[in-house]
Every structure is written in C-alpha cells, then in structure tokens.
Amino acid sequence: MGALKRMAPAISRRKLVYLSVVGALAATATLVVPTAADARITKVTITTKESPTFGGYSWPGVGQYEKILGTAYGELDPNDPHNAVIVDIKLAPRNAAGKVEYSHNFYLLKPIDLAKGNHKVVYDAVNRGSKTFSVLNRGLNGDDPGSVTDAQTLANTFLFPKGYSYAASGWDASAGTDPANFNLIINLPVAKNLDGTTITGPAYEYIVTSGASAGLTYAAATLNKSQAKLTHRVHLDDVPQVVPDAGWDYNADGTSIHLVGSNFVNNDIYEFSYVAKNPTVNGIGFAAVRDFMEWIRYEAEDDFKLANPMAGDVNRIYTITRSQPARMLNDFRTLGFNASEGNRKVFDAIFNWVGAADGINMNYRFSNPGTTQRNRQDQLYPEAFFPFANESTTDHISGMTAGRYDKCTATITCPLGMEVYSSNEYWVKAASLFHTDTQGTADLPGHPLARLYLISSHQHSNPGNVNSKGSCQQFGNPLASEPVQRALWEAMDKWSTQGIEPPPSMVPRLADGTLVPPLPQSAAGFPNIPGVTYTGLKSTRYRFNYGPNFYATGIMTTYPPVVSSPMFDNLANGPIYPSLVPKTDVDGNEIAGIRLPDVRVPIRTYSGWSLRSGVWANDGCEGSGQSVAFPATKANRVASGDPRLSVEERYPTFLDYYFKVAKAINDMVAERFMLPEDAGAAMNRMLNAGFATGAIKMEPEDVDE
C-alpha cells in the first residue's frame, strides 16, 4: 500500500494569472473606508466562557481551546442601499437613532493562545439552528462540540489540529426562539404597516406529519375558517381533496391546526392556506451573518468596551455548510451581503455542501427559511429564482441578465466559491441550471472565482444504510463525501492563501453528452435492473405566479400559486426552466463528476434519486438515494436476468479487487480529491464492503508473510 502515499501532481501555471487578479482585488479593497452609517454589532454579552474546553485536551503546536457563548445585538440602517434589499425592513420598528434592531446568540471555539492558531475562522452557517461542521471534522459533532473529551476523537479531528477558530451564530427564523441545548437562534422585528397597524396576508403550509396537530409559521389573522382551506391527498399528482370546515379547527390562538376526531396520516400530503399576521423581517438574517462576521474580523470591541475575543487575529474567514445554509449563502452572495455597509469583505471563501443552484425561502413576506423543495415536498414555497448561476446569464423568461457574483464584483468583495453537491440536487433541485443557460441548451464556462463539484451518484447529505429501505423502494445509498470535502477544503485554503488553483470543476456537460434528460431511460443510461422501478421522476423549476408584483417586491398576493396535476413538466403551472440530469454508465453509476472509489470499483449501483414504497409508491423519496447490489455470481446474474456483470465476473480474485481499489484511491489522491491521511480508512472500508458481498474472498496465498 505504499503507493497510497504518492503526492499530487504539480500545480497548473494558471495560478500565476489568478495571483495577479487576487493582488489587484486585495490592493483595491484595502482602500475602502467604512462610513459612519455602517450597520454594526453594538453590544455583545458573554454568558459562558469555558477555558480550557474539550476537557483540557491540547493539540500539538496549537495548545488548548476555549469556548465562548453569548449574544450579539445589532442594528441596521434601513435606508442604506446594502440593506434596502431586505424585504419589509422599512416597515420594521426603529430605535431613537432610526435603526432597526435584532439579536442572536453565538458559539465560539478558539485557541487560548491565538498566536498559536492559524488566524483563520470557520463560520458554521447552522442548519435550522444546529451545527453542520461534523461533515468535515471526522467524528467531532453535536451542538456542543466543546463538550467532547475523548482523546482519540479529538486527535483525529480535522480543523482544530490545524489551529482554526470556529464560530456559529443564529440567523434563521425557523430555528425558533428557544436557545436551549445550544440551539442558535435570532430575534427579529415584526413588520407593521406605516400607520402602525398589523400586516396581514396570504400564508401557506405544506404538512406531512403523523401528529395530532400542525404548527403554523405565523399566527392566523382570523379564526374564521371561511378564509382558510385545508386539503389532503396521498400522491403528489392526486387531485387535492378539500377537508370540510367541520373536519379541522384552529387552536385558541390560531398558531396551529388539528383534525377533528383523528390525527394527520403520516406521509400523506396536507396543504393549508390561510390569512396570517405579523410577518417577521426574515431577510435580516443575511445582515446578521454579515455584521457578526464583520465584527469578529475587524473590530476591537463593542460600544460598551467589551473586547472582541478574536480582535486582531483574523486573516481569513471560510464558511462550512450543509444543505439549507448553503442555499442561504447562495442568496447571501446574490443580494450582495458579502460586502458590509462600508464595503468591507466578510467571507474570503464559501464552502457549500449540497446547496447547488438553489436559494432559500427567506427574503419574502411571510417566508419560512426552514422549508426545502424536493421531488414531493414543499413545491410551492418561494425558494429558487433566477439567477441560478454564478456567472451572468440572461433569463429567457423574464429577460433579466444577472449572476450570483454580480454585486460582489461591483464592490470588489467576492468570496471564492467551492460548490460541492450530490446527484440528488439534479433530480430534485434542478442543479443543472448552475452550469447551463436558463433554457438548458448550452454549457456555461464557469465563474473564475468558483468551482463546481458533483459527487457522482451521491444522495443528499449524509450516507444512507445499505441494510434499510426506510420509506423508499430500495436500500440506502452509503456513499460518503467527507474525504472529498476535506481534500477540497485544503484546496480552497491554498487557493485563498497562496493563489494555487483547486482542481477544475467536475460536472456533467451537454458538450460531452454526460448531461441528459431523464427520459427516455435508454438515453439516460440507466439499466433495466430486475426489481428496480425507473420513472425518470425529476422536479421542475417553474417561474410561479405569486402575484403581479412579487418578483419586484418579495410580497406574495397569490399564495400558494395556482397549480394543477401533473405537478412536473406542466406548462399550465407556469413557465419552465428546463433542467437535466447526469448520464450513467451501463451499471447505472454516473459518468461525470468526482467518482468515489466505490463508483470507480463498484459492487453496487448507486443513485442520487429514489422512489417511495407502500401506498405512496413511485412518489419521490425526497433527499434519499438508493443502492442496488450487483449479483454476487454469474449464475445469480443469469438466473435473475440482471444486465450488470456480477461481482465474481468483475473481480475474479481478491488481489484483482485489491489492486483496483488501491489504484482508485491513489488516483483520487493524485487528483487532489482525497488526502493521503484518509487513504487508509478508505481502503479498509472498501475491502470490508467487498468481503460483505460474499464473492470476494481472501485466499491463503493472498497473505503476504
């Protein structure tokens, strides 16, 4: 296995070109002077300081860490152009200085001796209040990572041995208002009409629960049921059946609904439309992230002389995300929030996991950032709108020209972007729009400050269980992206600090035939596997009609939008942005993207999509993928009629399998998609998976004595 120690090839000369660009941007950015009108953190309170944390564990060369918990209080100038994009900010209450106030809690981990750290901060843009950095950090997880004391876990972790500081803070209204159990929350103002009266408007809930009641994001403005409607259906494409008024009711304060005499049926689809009141100004969450990171990076103290615990130390801030916060940071860039009111850069690089081309249901009146569209759920919430790509494109529907990097380009505050995502995003979130024009007819060249990486055949987020089907038709997809993420993180850091470019984008393309429609099945490449249903089910990205002024104001007057069955590929539901999916090889594994060792030396078919089972059969199984084992032997294959070669036909001996796995891992290290330190664990995992097939067996002669 000595070959696993090979180093990556020399870096491309293109880094010299990028260095000149970086130098120019940096030189220009240092000339910007913040104005007196800057939005800012005015007050910070520290509620907990644990020094040392991690049970006193000390990393060689870095030392011990401390944990700091507290609350940050901020204010925004509603008239500043940087904040004017926040929907309803001019209708939020103001203090005596004419500013809009908010607060959020935070969680910091930092070296006690900052001089021993690497002067870089990892900002965890939390998912619905919970921390996400476990996807990168090798087993160190939970919402209070500082409480971990196991020496082996801490020694093996990824970020802290390198001296990173860590920060997380609340930004998401859907995380609630309870900070218990280290939940990170934000307290937001409620918008009022200019005359001080209560704002009301249409609101919508998609309900999938087995409970007796379903909470509402916003309280009902009236308990008069004639101004509300509850519907029920089993399949996405069933005609919704109206639940009679006598069949449901509000609770006393209009904050939840319940069925009369029964519970909601788990996994059935209920939709509730009603008139709501008191919208929170959720778009302030963008500014809260911006201003807290600006304070951490640039300020010495708050207005009350409380010292910034990171003062004078921060040279770089990178983000880490998973899913929902990645979508938030997509809109964060689009709306220009990487520049403070004084045009100071906030993030040097954004590392997004499973965000792809999507946005977030946040900067709209009566929005709910906790929702997420997939291939069955939450289809009608406002989530993903043009622009989808980082570079500027023209929307063939609206005629607008824009890109996610346009605003930061104008202020010279663009972050580097590492966009890492799964196959699932193509099937349920139209990820192809990240790198095609809006008509799906031409590949985009890619923005020079961003890279796009598909993890081939991967499901959304965490690995699935190969021994469980859950609510899906097939067993879970076990592919794990974490080693690739760590390698790309290192590449991102070198890009930011040294100008060494990361590997080129790895996505399916129209030009090479690896980006295709899901139907017909033969053109998509997916084989006819016995017992596996393939329907080509893929979500459709529409430009929905939320009312005449929605796309200019963020205020919905038609909510939910009017749609009809079928849900997908139906022009009656609105203009369509065509999207495509990755083509597969003869085994059903995707051709383009970063192919993990499991895909390069397969024993299964791995898919980023899956279908539901039971009474909901053939509806989408949301973020779940699937895996279908190859036949173990040729006899099994012939008997079942499976077109895929069996395991024994592919790998006639243990050593054949062993050396193919070793080559796959070596290649990933050479390509900079795996760190040498992760190679051994990958080898062991692959060997164990091979043994589990029963067709790969180590013989006595395979043992090196």
PLM regions: where:
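C-terminal His-loop and adjacent cap/lid subdomain of alpha/beta-hydrolase
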Residues: D38-E705
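N-terminal export leaders
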Residues: L16-V17, V289
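C-terminal segment of classical bacterial N-terminal signal peptides
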Residues: A27-A36
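N-terminal secretory signal peptides that target proteins for export/translocation
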Residues: M1-R13
